[in-house]
Amino acid sequence: MRAHHNGVMTDHIIVLPGGGYTDLSDDEAEPVAAWLAGLGLSSSVFRYPVQTRHPGPLDAVRAEVRRIRADGHERVGLLGFSAGGHAAGHATLAPLSADPDAAAAERVDLAILCYPVVSMELPTHADSRRQLIGLDATPELRASTSLDRLVTRDAPPFFIWHTAEDASVPVQHAYLLATALADHGIPHALHVFSRGRHGLNLAIGQGDAEQWTTLCAAWLREEGWIA
């Protein structure tokens, strides 16, 4: 954890709750920000617009990244669950603004994706696809909103976790993104737990999946975000 001379922490993580781009889960919001605060991190919850088509959520998340950075935070990370994981990954991986100053302001320095929707091409969370791009979206639009298709060698580090028996968002989504990151030489951690339904949030009392917060804290320490 680092701080400016004026006392403002230089690192900040924005939490993006899930909800299938239809609504937003309170369980994946303030409790998660409180956990991050317990690690000594500056954090906030951003309730991005739902029931609106692409690029509405992407533009809103990037505007929030710019706002947080303008407040004095040098490094900005995103942590998202399910559809919020897609929103986090999309803001991290989609092409940046052509203007160098704007691109620097909206850049994401680290991403934590929890049971994320990754691909709009694979079988996916129907609500997410319906709300974001529509079930009749063109192949081009489906590809351009699939995170695994957007990975480049400029991507930041990623932490991803999922459960093998997730019936809402198949675990193949996590594997797809991890494979794309590996193919491009991007540092990343992937944890897949055998048991657990979709939407576990902090996974307290949920078997092995409860380890994700401990594993993530260790990863954040390794990446230099916490002491």
What are these regions (language model features)?
Residues L24-D27, P31-V32, S44-R75, A203-A209:
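Catalytic nucleophile-loop/oxyanion-hole region of alpha/beta-hydrolase
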Residues D154, I160-H162, D166:
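Short beta-strand/loop motif that positions the catalytic acidic residue
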Residues A167-L176:
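Conserved alpha/beta-hydrolase "acid-adjacent" motif
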Residues A63-D127, R142:
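Primarily recognizes the serine-hydrolase "nucleophile elbow" in alpha/beta-hydrolase
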Residues H12, G40-S44:
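A fold-wide structural signal in alpha/beta-hydrolase
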